[in-house]
Amino acid sequence: MAAAAGDGGGEGGAGLGSAAGLGPGPGLRGQGPSAEAHEGAPDPMPAALHPEEVAARLQRMQRELSNRRKILVKNLPQDSNCQEVHDLLKDYDLKYCYVDRNKRTAFVTLLNGEQAQNAIQMFHQYSFRGKDLIVQLQPTDALLCITNVPISFTSEEFEELVRAYGNIERCFLVYSEVTGHSKGYGFVEYMKKDFAAKARLELLGRQLGASALFAQWMDVNLLASELIHSKCLCIDKLPSDYRDSEELLQIFSSVHKPVFCQLAQDEGSYVGGFAVVEYSTAEQAEEVQQAADGMTIKGSKVQVSFCAPGAPGRSTLAALIAAQRVMHSNQKGLLPEPNPVQIMKSLNNPAMLQVLLQPQLCGRAVKPAVLGTPHSLPHLMNPSISPAFLHLNKAHQSSVMGNTSNLFLQNLSHIPLAQQQLMKFENIHTNNKPGLLGEPPAVVLQTALGIGSVLPLKKELGHHHGEAHKTSSLIPTQTTITAGMGMLPFFPNQHIAGQAGPGHSNTQEKQPATVGMAEGNFSGSQPYLQSFPNLAAGSLLVGHHKQQQSQPKGTEISSGAASKNQTSLLGEPPKEIRLSKNPYLNLASVLPSVCLSSPASKTTLHKTGIASSILDAISQGSESQHALEKCIAYSPPFGDYAQVSSLRNEKRGSSYLISAPEGGSVECVDQHSQGTGAYYMETYLKKKRVY
């Protein structure tokens, strides 16, 4: 048999070499590269093995092939337990036993496949407590076939390769029954399917020397002595522009005529680089493989290896094409991942901004996801998108990024501060009852907000809602509010120090100017905010101030007080660009066509500030409290406040249903204001609480 195979191989080599335009075949027969060899350098032909070594290898392969030691014992009595199964199989070494009473089935693992076969013969159709038992091998779905393994791999090296991905039940290489050498593929069965799936993904395309491994699922019923030898060959490393199927068929018909021979094609076009040839028997395929491996076709030295056994040639070719596609794409998605610059440019699209702001606008769900954004992080600062924003925030002043993008990035950094400020006012007035964790220390909020002292709010706040003098008493001192306003951003169309709109009452007109903003702070933000001239200006109120007051004086007072009292734990805020920290006042970046007013409204807007607006809103009573609760961000940075906010949000299931403004607006909003902030503030103050 060995002599016949050798003669056939020599003739096949000569025939294949002649068809390819080469010399005698024996000199062309390589057996493939080793794991240690350099890529493209084939191993020399392995030396002939001693007959005893060949017999030992084949015996080891047969032992592992039949080493299926897991059995099923079916049709057990309903009340059976593991002890009864142990007593039934007391003559065998049980490694594992589990009884499923619902299925009336026992899952048993014995010492080896020999005991499993013996137990099947002994207890199949065995009568046990009036039931005829059904004993059979357990099916497995964790079996893989690994091809393109270097032929120099030993069984120990192959086991080390596959064991890295999980516990294995068995593994073995397939050896030639003629020469005893490895045929370049093997099988591995894992304990769990998860291990097998991981190994398949990791091994697919893994480079070992000049070979790229290929892993695929296998049917356990194919693990039989007459079925594990493959009839299909893969001709790899063909010229990429090779299209001559007739020539390829002629070359591989010199020794034995194949039943299938085709170049790789994907959707009618040639993939290039490899082909599949199928023969009638495994012996014919082995002879051709030995003769053709390492031959040259059109200047390229091809690699001829065995495919996985069991499937016909056409199915094998389709599986190889699919695997080639996966390896070329490096197991990535169909669409490439966008880089940070592309993400930033997409922020100019209102639809993209709306998607990003969706969690912030809709609030937190009643029951947050187990693996969702941490409670201590705002929705827009979750780990999935923060790297791109952190990277792009460094280059946000570039003209390529656009005005809207820069505004959006700045607002992201201001959201936590706005949450702290609004939550402070809510806890002072609307939260008369102590929280579940007690009252938070005032020093924490003061330090985080950069405010030197507690805002001097009077105790009678909220008892007499309609009195103007109560509202005026809520205005803090000049130094305190100026320090607080150092943390609050403004838009460029707002008045600077000493420029405020006309008052609503004589009482308010008599109040001194307490809030100012340095004009120089707006110089850096002008290019980025010109597209938002009407945004949120009308809803921000400050103590009214006569226009005759000198502008430089107010500027000096404001900037001096802010520099003395800003001692934030988070560091100094950016001074060049100051934007609104309230996410609800920045909706123009999401819906510019709805939020932005006509250009004519620029001249009629009354410029105001946010601190007095919040204080006046608090003095309005219960409805103002509801409005402030809806303005509060739903993911505050501090855990103490997250408790209160979450409890209130659980009671409130309504969405933000915006109604048209009605006549007789509340006192804290100017009747002539046309800005978006005024519109939303009016709506919030009028809405009723919905449970």
Swiss-Prot record:
Any one GO molecular function term: RNA binding
- Per the UniProt entry, the disulfide pairs are none
Q: Which PROSITE patterns match?
A: RRM
The record's annotation in Gene3D superfamilies points to: 3.30.70.330
Q: InterPro entries per the record?
A: Euk_RNA-bind_prot, Nucleotide-bd_a/b_plait_sf, RAVER2_RRM1, RAVER2_RRM2, RAVER2_RRM3, RBD_domain_sf, RRM_dom
Domain RRM, by residue range, is 69-140, 142-220, 231-309
Key word Ribonucleoprotein present: no
Places the protein is found: Nucleus; Cytoplasm
- Name the record gives this protein: Ribonucleoprotein PTB-binding 2
Organism of origin: Homo sapiens (Human)
